[in-house]
Regions:
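N-terminal strand-loop-strand
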Residues: 1-42, 55
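Short, surface-exposed helix-loop/turn micro-motifs enriched in polar/charged residues
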Residues: 7, 72, 89, 194-195
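Unchanged
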Residues: 41, 48-74, 79-169, 187-188
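A generic structural signal for alpha-helix starts
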Residues: 49-53, 177, 194
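Short acidic, hydrophobic short linear motifs in intrinsically disordered regions
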Residues: 173-186
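Short, positively charged loop/turn segments that connect secondary-structure elements
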Residues: 188-196
């Protein structure tokens, strides 16, 4: 069979990184240093190298862009996205990952490689919509590069859907906590927990 007749996409990985900080759920974004979307917020992401394992690629890209070292026990595949024209430069397929920073895993994030800066943003679902804030600034769909807003939404919905039977988001919490703290954590993804 002639494989040359088939087009070959570039493969990327995107990382949705969560942590628990001052009783809030946060996600780590970068500001892009280069075009396309220069100056926009983005997930830590990059191209998978030839013959590179996907988990290795996720950890490498996050380390290169943010200086954060992920624990491979706390990452999991979220979704594969191949929407046409998602990257204006070329045809790409991305594998997005959920990544959980343990509460006691204190690391200094520092921008490098394709990142101009790093930002821990508060994230929550409010009235059924994604709310993303960087200090006093509220972010909207067009503030994020590529389809990263949609990937964040998918991440929030995935975690919400698994709160009852597989709450991997607990990986970001301190080992000992109160029922109120767990309700607040779960309420970040599903507001009904805040009314209990």
């Amino acid at each position: 069979e002639e494989l040359d007749k088939y087009a070959k996409p570039s493969v990327t990985v995107d990382s949705v990184i969560f942590r628990y900080f001052e009783e809030r759920v946060q996600t780590l974004l970068i500001k892009r240093k280069n075009h396309p979307y220069m100056g926009k917020y983005a997930l830590s992401s990059g191209f998978v190298q030839e013959q590179e394992d996907l988990n290795t690629a996720v950890c490498r890209e996050v380390r290169e862009e943010t200086s954060v070292q992920l624990n491979t026990d706390h990452i999991e595949q979220l979704v594969t996205v191949g929407t046409p024209y998602r990257d204006p430069r070329m045809w790409t397929i991305t594998i997005a990952y959920l990544c959980f920073m343990a509460f006691n895993d204190i690391q200094m994030d520092k921008a490098a490689d394709d990142a101009a800066s790093t930002h821990w943003l508060d994230i929550a679902m409010v009235n059924g919509k994604l709310q993303l804030t960087d200090g006093d600034k509220t972010l909207y769909h067009d503030d994020l590069a590529f389809d990263h807003w949609e990937i964040l939404l998918i991440a929030m919905e995935r975690i919400k859907g698994r709160l009852e039977y597989c709450p991997t988001i607990l990986n970001i919490m301190p080992e000992e906590n109160t029922l109120t703290a767990y309700h607040q954590l779960f309420g970040t993804f599903n507001e009904t927990y805040l009314k209990m």
